[in-house]
Amino acid sequence: MKNDFIMNITLDDPLATNILSCWEKYKHNKFNITKVETCTNNGIQTSNVLELLDFKQDNIFQECLNNILQNIKNLLGLNLYYCWVHFVEYLEGGYQDIHNHKQNEDYSFVLYLNTCSDGETYFNVEPPISILPNKNNMILFSSNIDHGAKTCYNKKVLVGGLRRYS
């Protein structure tokens, strides 16, 4: 993709706190957790929350999603929409295999829901970039950039993909 980028953005609290509260409330519903093979190792991941009733009916969560989308649209000056959003919680020793999303979306994001001293998100670019998880920080990047997450003790993130309207 032309003009590839990686941005580290700090969002206002209580956005991450409210999103984390929703995750803690709904992660115990077995219908929200996917069993499909993903790049997530030693962790749990939701199906697309845009399609899950618990999250669709939660007004606070929907307001948070709208806030994230509006922030990104304003930052990029583009008309965008969500194509997917997932929660991922990494357990002790959890990590994310290197991958990209070029086949699915134009832009990707990782919103950190807690602060960790490990579990950096890394990007396979020159020079290499590695970002430690800090609550309220969101990494926004071009979807074709290879990325992964290093081993962690316990990390919670909201990840998503966005497309431009044609």
Kindly give the residue locations of the regions a language model identified.
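Non-heme Fe(II)/2-oxoglutarate
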Residues: 1-78
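Catalytic core of non-heme Fe(II) oxygenases with the double-stranded beta-helix
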Residues: 77-166
